[in-house]
Amino acid sequence: MKFKKISFLVSCVLLVSVSCSDYQKLLNSDDTSEKYKQAEVFYNNGEYRKANRLFEQIVPKYRGKPQAQRIIFFFADSYFQSKSYSLAAYQYENFVKSYPKSDRIQEATFKAAKSYYFQSPTYSLDQEETYEAIEKLQIFINLYPSSEYAAEANQMIAELQEKLEKKDFEIAKQYYTIRDYKSAIKANDNFVAGFPGTKLREEALYVKFLALYEIATNSVLSKKEARLKELQQQYALILRYYPETLFMEDLNGKMEKVNKELEQFNTTTTLSK
């Protein structure tokens, strides 16, 4: 039994070696027609990297010929399927420019835009590629609003917008973390104004409340009452939009202290009359 297993493994290794050897011979061959045939076989079998190398070799040979359109599309798509998105975007765009009347024009335009989408980095990094991806996807939607890919394109734009929102919000929140409370207030105001429909609006209003709280409770006496009242207004604003806010416990705890301080101001004012 053990001998059979070893024999089977040896056979597999030899088969792979022969296969690799045949593929290398094909790469070194001058038989363009056979390369084209095998490139499509590899592509259809999901061996996109192997297909890609063959397509790359034969693209110049078929340029200007009837097969060129098909080959260039599959060349681009083999990059896409191999997750080489930068090269895929370039080749799809090359296809779109070369064959504007192709039956595959929508698919190529969409996949070019989708390639930019896949290149968008995590929110903590520079978002230049995210903006570019949104632009490409929006251009696609404008060109083909009824396309079968339009819904997916809109969904990708929404995801990228959320990434930009998170980026801006984390910057706004960072001001609070480093105790630059005035900048935190301004940044969160700008964030809410810039992204009125954001899912992070509740938290942004809360972070602004926290910044106002730190300023108000540490103010000199001459400015304290006005700032505590501003804090009351921010608290009321949060409850108006989010009556069951996730931050209720902390908000109520802080407002108890605020209200007690305001009562002291009211008592002092009454006694002075």
Where do the language-model regions lie?
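Bacterial N-terminal signal peptides
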Residues: V10-S17
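Acidic, polar-rich low-complexity tracts and alpha-helical solenoid repeat scaffolds
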Residues: K2-I6, S19-K273
